[in-house]
Amino acid sequence: MSQKYLFIDRDGTLISEPPSDFQVDRFDKLAFEPEVIPVLLKLQKAGFKLVMITNQDGLGTQSFPQADFDGPHNLMMQIFTSQGVCFDEVLICPHLPADDCDCRKPKVKLVERYLAEQAMDSANSYVIGDRATDIQLADNMGITGLRYHRETLNWTMIGEQLTKRDRYAHVVRNTKETQIDVSVWLDREGNSKINTGVGFFDHMLDQIATHGGFRMEITVKGDLYIDDHHTVEDTGLALGEALKLALGDKRGICRFGFVLPMDECLARCALDISGRPHLEYKAEFTYQRVGDLSTEMIEHFFRSLSYTMGVTLHLKTKGKNDHHRVESLFKAFGRTLRQAIRVEGDTLPSSKGVL
């Protein structure tokens, strides 16, 4: 998975910018913006890597000697490092606007390597700065810009905005047999809308969302004039992919889940969001169909889902009523998924450092 980055301006964003000459060229001019250090620590824990990018007009010239810049800058970096704030890179353009160089913000020369394919997670990377040129840089990079201001968008607000969970994914899967559109919101509940053309299957998918504590919208157009095979199978593939994408870097998730009794049935579900697809399934049914859903397709659905989601899934149910047996499997999976996707911290739940 590609990396999340924050490209952060220096003067006026990390540290205060002197209004007299816009140069931090003496130690007494060095002052940190409020809450910048604790918020950057919080953002690092949330998985962001930090890159400083700054225009320093005329750096190295008589109007702004390098030595005058180096003292306060090095002290600033030492303070950041001593508090645990680590910048992967510090990118500096020393030119004046009149020089018409390639590296001055909002041009992208300094950040070209991050624009290579899959070098960064563009959907979750940001430019943070106090000037319009910082927002223009974000536009040129194809990422979101956040314009820092002590009153309207300060570091506390930025930290809250960037660490607030709203895990979402949208998957479209089109084949000759099916056209499927799936959206999932892992941190929202209710208002799920599901239409696969197979009524009982819709009801079962809704059980996953309801007991999983999340919202999803699924629309399927399948070759039901033949049977429900492709509709159920491809829905499982698309839903599994959407859940995997919505989980993102999996940082802070519980990872494991277990459960569930239902009426005369006892369903057991064990789930590990491991990155290793595997299904163990045991369920017997008296009839070939429950409503308009083929009972043989239930295992196929969970196998397809576990494959694209990348999870280890054990499912088992016993009971007397086919409807209850089927429903117990979907409810147990939903309830188990609720436990596993819940966020309880900010670390990756793996001794290997990867899921």
Curated annotation (Swiss-Prot):
Signal peptide: none
EC number, as in UniProt: 3.1.3.15, 4.2.1.19
CDD domains to which the protein is assigned, alphabetical: HAD_HisB-N (cd07503), IGPD (cd07914)
A family per Pfam: Hydrolase_like
Histidinol-phosphatase: region residues: 1-166
Keyword Transcription regulation tagged: no
Active-site residues, as the UniProt record annotates them: 9, 11
Predominant location: cytoplasm
Disulfide bonds: none
Gene3D superfamilies: HAD superfamily/HAD-like (3.40.50.1000), Imidazole glycerol phosphate dehydratase, domain 1 (3.30.230.40)
UniProt binding sites for Zn(2+): 93, 95, 101, 103
Catalytic activity: D-erythro-1-(imidazol-4-yl)glycerol 3-phosphate = 3-(imidazol-4-yl)-2-oxopropyl phosphate + H2O; L-histidinol phosphate + H2O = L-histidinol + phosphate
Pathway info: Amino-acid biosynthesis; L-histidine biosynthesis; L-histidine from 5-phospho-alpha-D-ribose 1-diphosphate: step 6/9; Amino-acid biosynthesis; L-histidine biosynthesis; L-histidine from 5-phospho-alpha-D-ribose 1-diphosphate: step 8/9
GO cellular component, one term: cytoplasm
Region (Imidazoleglycerol-phosphate dehydratase) residue spans: 167-355
Family recorded in the similarity comment: In the N-terminal section; belongs to the histidinol-phosphatase family. In the C-terminal section; belongs to the imidazoleglycerol-phosphate dehydratase family.
Name of the molecule in the record: Histidine biosynthesis bifunctional protein HisB
Organism the protein comes from: Salmonella typhimurium (strain LT2 / SGSC1412 / ATCC 700720)
